[in-house]
Swiss-Prot record:
The keyword RNA-binding does not apply. Its cofactor is Zn(2+). Its main location: endoplasmic reticulum. This is Fatty acid 2-hydroxylase. Pathway: Lipid metabolism; fatty acid metabolism; Sphingolipid metabolism; galactosylceramide biosynthesis. It comes from Macaca fascicularis (Crab-eating macaque). GO terms for cellular component: endoplasmic reticulum membrane; membrane.
């Protein structure tokens, strides 16, 4: 027989107040206490919105308005559970706790919302690399991978390969921006020589000259095309549903994108690591060189590469930044968080929602009484 779980810690109202005075952000749901101090800067509604509710019962906030939090958001909250509120019940705050606690006892439907995350009973062993385990999940993989957790992920046994599978955010601009600048300078000089022609592989008589004044337009075309590529890759490759009986396709999905949905705030896995990124970027470069004249294809590639850098930096900021309420990035952050926690089959645009509008995959705005 398995040993009984240890009793939950308990805190008096005065103990909670001392922690709040020290700067911690504790909230409660009924008598259950949660320490959100490490999460406040990630909150999609902004840090101040969450800190303003420190010490309060957030039950009404979870149910809306402005929106009803999803099952994943409630499950996420349970990972910050620290114990129970005890002691003399004073004022409306404590009376609400008693009332909600009684509701929990009589309403079985509320039980899953208060279920504590048990790492020892998860479908995988978090003490071991995950990549070799996820393929065995089969039909359970898709549901499991879309239930986000707060902890970091280890993929490989080898420290070397593990190190190559993650990176810091600033490696992206450090490595790729100098290449963008070099390619832009090099291909602009080629345009300036006046020897760039289109359709020379088909005809010399009707080949079209490409003046250097076209350089900015081609560069911007590359940025624009990247936004479409970003959308298509995210929607059709990253969000493919691997066959439940394919061990290796499940592994492939997890290493490409599933790991990010499982641990959305693992900062070392938010941007593409340089080594695998260089292989993909190299393929795009070769394709453009085969299709277009060198200077034209290279200029479009340079713009696309800058578009990729902007995408990765935007993606990182949407997870770890705190944009001003009502700003473009604030709305983009809210859109992306909904994609992670509730709408994994829509909202595929990261740096822009343009293509979600075009392909009708925009996350719908719903009244707060409906779960988002």
């Amino acid at each position: 027989m398995a040993p009984a779980p240890p009793p939950a810690a308990s805190f008096s109202p005065s103990e909670v107040q001392r922690r709040l005075a020290a700067g911690a952000c504790w909230v409660r749901r009924g008598a259950r206490l949660y320490d959100l101090s490490s999460f406040v800067r990630h909150h999609p509604g902004g840090e101040q919105l969450l800190r303003a509710r420190a010490g309060q019962d957030i039950s009404a906030d979870l149910d809306g308005p402005p929106h009803r939090h999803s099952a994943n958001a409630r499950r996420w909250l349970e990972q910050y559970y620290v114990g129970e509120l005890r002691g003399e019940q004073q004022g409306s705050m404590e009376n609400e706790a008693v009332a909600l606690e009684e509701t929990q006892k009589t309403d079985p439907a509320m039980e899953p919302r208060f279920k504590v995350v048990d790492w020892d009973k998860d479908l995988v062993d978090w003490q071991k690399p995950l990549l070799w385990q996820v393929g065995h999940l089969g039909e359970k993989y898709d549901e499991w991978v879309h239930q986000p957790v707060t902890r970091p992920i280890r993929l490989f046994h080898s420290d070397l390969i593990e190190g190559l599978s993650k990176t810091v955010w600033y490696s992206v601009p450090i490595i790729w921006v100098p290449l963008v600048l070099y390619l832009s300078w090099s291909y602009y000089r080629t345009f300036a020589q006046g020897n760039v022609r289109l359709f020379t592989s088909f005809t010399t008589e009707y080949a079209l000259a490409v003046p250097k004044s076209m350089f900015p337009g081609l560069f911007m075309l590359g940025i624009f095309l990247w936004s479409l590529i970003e959308y298509l890759i995210h929607r059709f490759l990253f969000h493919m549903k691997p066959p439940s009986d394919s061990y290796y396709l499940i592994m492939l999905h997890f290493v490409m994108h599933g790991q990010h949905h499982k641990a959305p705030f693992d900062g070392s896995r938010l941007v593409f690591p340089p080594v695998p990124a260089s292989l993909v970027i190299g393929v795009f470069y070769l394709c453009l060189q085969l299709i277009l004249p060198e200077a034209v294809g290279g200029t479009v590639f340079a713009g696309g590469l800058l578009g990729y850098v902007l995408y990765d930096m935007t993606h990182y900021y949407l997870h770890f930044g705190s944009p001003h309420r009502g700003s473009y990035l604030y709305n983009l952050k809210a859109h992306h968080v909904k994609h992670h926690f509730a709408h994994q089959k829509s909202g595929f645009g990261i740096s822009t929602k343009l293509w979600d509008y075009c392909f009708h995959t925009l996350i719908p705005e719903k009244p707060h009484l409906k779960t988002q």
